Design a protein with these regions (language model features):
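Active-site microenvironment for binding and transforming phosphate-containing groups
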Residues: 1-205
């Protein structure tokens, strides 16, 4: 069964089209059921390949997407070919017809396009990347004017289910404390990753 995909409405130029996959459909089994796209979590590579090919077929892509090897870093790379072995958590391209992919579970998937539609980028943003400035570094590489960007922030772990400790609080509180809420336990907070990203983007202009 093909992986179910849904089109993203995010205000990007008409020539920029984005989709996200769901857990419906696909060939992965067990804990990975059923539409896992990652080759780095222990799933059967053949099943992952089928899942990826399902999306390529449905979207009638001329080129395979660029998949990053995501490592929870703040590294930004330029993508030039589907065969690029990009070890990073953010990439961008100016090559027409070259799709970019970002994988996420608890972390934030962020899509970015220039207003003229000549450049696109993706960011995989967890707390480590956000604390290390991945959004700021991406914008510095991507655009001279942050106001020239169209941004979509995708789904991530719900704040009620995301509890962090003092070490993470200390790192992210340098940005703001608005995205934390206290838990019943001493030294523990709920963290709203999406709110973190929104505050950083607002600070960047």
């Amino acid at each position: 069964m093909d992986v179910q995909i849904r089109k993203i409405a995010w205000g990007a130029p008409k020539n920029i089209i984005a989709y996200h996959s769901t857990k419906i459909g696909g060939w992965s089994d067990g804990a990975f059921a059923s539409s896992n796209m990652s080759l780095d979590v222990g799933d059967n590579p053949k099943d992952v390949k089928k899942n990826r090919e399902s999306i390529i077929k449905q979207l009638k892509l001329d080129s395979k997407p660029v998949f990053m090897k995501q490592i929870h870093s703040a590294t930004v790379r330029a993508a030039k070919s589907p065969s690029d072995n990009l070890v990073c958590d953010s990439c961008y391209t100016t090559i027409k017809g070259l799709p970019l992919a970002v994988l996420s579970a608890d972390c934030l998937p962020i899509l970015i396009s220039s207003n003229d539609g000549n450049k696109i980028g993706v960011i995989h943003a967890g707390w480590r990347g956000l604390a290390s400035g991945i959004i700021q570094k991406f914008i510095k590489r991507f655009s001279r004017d942050p106001k020239d960007l169209v941004v979509w922030i995708g789904p991530s772990i719900n704040p009620e289910n995301y509890i962090i400790r003092e070490d993470v609080f200390n790192k992210l509180s340098k940005i703001s404390t608005k995205f934390f809420s206290r838990t019943k336990d001493v030294g523990a907070w709920h963290l709203d990753l999406k709110y973190v990203a929104k505050i950083i983007l607002k600070q960047e202009g």
